[in-house]
A protein has these predicted regions:
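Conserved beta-strand/loop elements of the cytosolic catalytic core of P-type E1-E2 ATPases, chiefly
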Residues: 33, 102, 209-213
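Short, structured coil segments at secondary-structure junctions
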Residues: 50, 72-74, 82, 191-194, ...
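Asp-based phosphoryl-transfer active-site loop
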Residues: 20-35
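Short, Lys/Arg-enriched N-terminal segments with co-localized hydrophobic residues
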Residues: 6-18
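Active-site phosphate-binding/coordination module
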Residues: 38-141
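Conserved acidic, metal-coordinating active-site core of Asp-based
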Residues: 121-236, 257
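Mg2+-dependent phosphoryl-transfer enzymes with acidic/Ser/Thr/Gly-rich catalytic loops
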Residues: 19-20, 39-40, 207-287
Length: 287
């Protein structure tokens, strides 16, 4: 009997479980969304027509994910705030939390006061379940508004406001100055707050969430609840914060616009986010 080369056998085994993908996890910015911050009609059609359940996994708030959820007609579980919130959309379009990881109120107050005192030029805002808050309108807030098409709630007396808040999921800072970004990150690390995670997103964003708010933990929760094996899952991503997600699934697919070190862990590299890469990848690699 002719011996079949091992790499061919492995490839054939992978193709077997590609035909049985039961859930896809998908990053948004740089992955699902194009450079205009939108899901193109053609991409949405390709994804919907595949008929495979999709979970969006994002650092965004639910309100910033809504347009994509609607475009893909998603009714299942979604992951927001880098895993700080697992939720689904109710019959009346309300956000129904399934699992939450919020930042402690005293920590939120300490962070906001410290950042504003030492870095007054940095754009600073924060999120609860349904709202985006800021204390001034600046370049960063305008940039985020143009990207997400959301409008923040302006807070006049932040101390008084925070006394009544206990459900902050994310603190977000935006700066377009690289030196300022490095100094800000160094300052936040020096606070040595054990219950938070500080993550850089792209060139201009620094985001703070609960220590347990991680994309990988959100995915692990869904895998347990739905009793899915690794081989039954796929994921699409482009950034370093997507690596844990990509490593958790059987079929990690990376965008053409990703960095080379992200591409190195991919089973397949799909087209870029401006070329309907997610829809193309599903139709060509997962069906």
């Amino acid at each position: 009997m002719e011996r079949v080369p091992e790499f061919i056998m492995v490839a054939k085994e992978r193709e077997v479980y590609f035909m049985n993908i039961k859930r896809i996890f998908c990053d948004m910015d740089g992955t699902l969304l194009n450079s205009e911050g939108q899901v193109s009609d053609s991409n949405a059609t390709l994804i919907r027509d595949a008929g495979i359940p999709v979970t969006l996994v994002s650092a965004r708030a639910p309100m910033e994910m809504k347009d994509a959820v609607d475009a893909l007609q998603l009714r299942g579980v979604q992951v927001a705030f880098n895993g700080g919130l697992i939720y689904r959309i109710g019959d009346n379009n309300e956000v129904l939390p399934i699992r939450t990881q919020i930042i402690k109120k005293s920590t939120v107050k300490q962070l906001l006061r410290g950042i504003r005192q030492h870095f007054p030029q940095v754009s600073l805002s924060y999120y609860d379940l349904n709202n985006w808050y800021c204390d001034k309108i600046d370049e960063g807030i305008r940039y985020e508004h143009n990207l997400t098409k959301q409008s923040p709630t302006f807070i006049h007396n932040e101390d008084q406001f925070l006394e009544g808040k206990s459900n902050t999921f994310k603190i977000m800072m935006i700066t377009f100055d690289e030196e300022n970004m490095r100094e800000l990150a160094k300052y936040l690390q020096s606070l040595d707050l054990p219950e938070i995670t500080i993550q850089r997103s792209g060139k201009a964003y620094l985001e703070i969430t609960h220590l347990l708010a991680k994309k990988s933990k959100g995915i692990a929760h869904i895998l347990r609840k739905e009793q899915l094996t690794k081989e039954e899952t796929a994921a699409f991503g482009d950034g370093h914060n997507d690596l844990p997600m990509l490593e958790m699934v059987g079929s990690p697919i990376v965008m053409d616009n990703a960095f080379d070190d992200i591409k190195a862990i991919a089973y397949k590299i799909t087209k870029s986010n401006d070329e309907d890469g997610v829809g193309y990848g599903i139709q060509n690699f997962l069906k």
